[in-house]
């Protein structure tokens, strides 16, 4: 997508304590601010690395905060992602590509859709609607009719998101603009 960063995200069946022990074998710069969500971070050379245990979260309808439930499989973890374009994984050791929700096809086609019904996805985390708008404006994606309808019908759900998270997403949308070109 023409954007290189210095961060790597991993997901694993290892629990946070095990992940932290493994990371400490490679660096002393680790942090566990996301431990409650199953995430351990580390600085390895020039890379910021975050490793999160597979999750299969449960959400209360009046809150954006999930009840953290560790998952058992990669596929279960990927289905909880915001969009299919973010629901792909590469097994680091075997280099096996996992794309159970056709995210690569959606990238090539410039389509933004959710791994499961958008009403559930946006109910779980209403900020995803704002992320859809950002991906559309910055990366040139087109949302599916189902995603657009869910965004329209569920716009009021944004009210349960903290003002800080809304501000941060708006800042990303307005300040990090690049010309749309998801398939270039």
Set out the residue ranges of the language-model regions:
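Catalytic cores of the polymerase beta-like nucleotidyltransferase superfamily
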Residues: 1-182
């Amino acid at each position: 997508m023409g954007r290189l960063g210095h961060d790597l995200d991993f997901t694993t069946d290892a629990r946070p304590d095990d992940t932290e022990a493994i990371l400490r074998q490679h660096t002393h710069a680790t942090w566990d601010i996301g431990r409650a969500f199953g995430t351990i971070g580390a600085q390895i050379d020039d890379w910021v690395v975050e490793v999160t245990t597979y999750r299969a979260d449960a959400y209360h309808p009046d809150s954006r905060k999930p009840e953290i439930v560790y998952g058992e499989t990669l596929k279960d973890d990927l289905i909880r992602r915001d969009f299919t374009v973010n629901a792909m994984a590469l097994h680091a050791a075997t280099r096996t590509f996992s794309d159970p929700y056709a995210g690569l096809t959606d990238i090539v086609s410039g389509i933004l859709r959710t791994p499961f019904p958008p009403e559930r996805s946006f109910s779980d985390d209403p900020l995803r609607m704002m992320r859809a708008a950002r991906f559309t404006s910055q990366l040139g994606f087109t949302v599916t009719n189902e995603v657009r309808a869910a965004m329209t019908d569920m716009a009021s759900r944004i009210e349960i998101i903290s003002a800080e998270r809304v501000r941060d997403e708006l800042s990303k949308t307005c300040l990090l603009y690049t010309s749309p070109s998801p398939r270039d």
